[in-house]
């Protein structure tokens, strides 16, 4: 069988595989994670789950803009409770806290605790100034 036959749609369907065609490649929404987190110091040695969490935080910034969630001097913040992080990443409480702490240590996040059982205000920080 010629190599080109492997990529034919009929063959794909016989093997319970299906390819994306033309406009179908844009059917889904995606989280964006900055490439510099994988290529530049001091980020490239960070836990991959912390990098993913940073991408989730950046995604939630869109909701902050729509909701008008800005604090002093117009700084954008997000509400992203530990229970939601645990659910989204499929991890335990301690792991979620560890990932947030790792982002803080890398200079990618600042947390402002509110107390009284309220979720912390999370400020995702720009990464450009942290690249060595």
Give each language-model segment a name.
Residues 56, 125-127:
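Generic beta-structure capping elements
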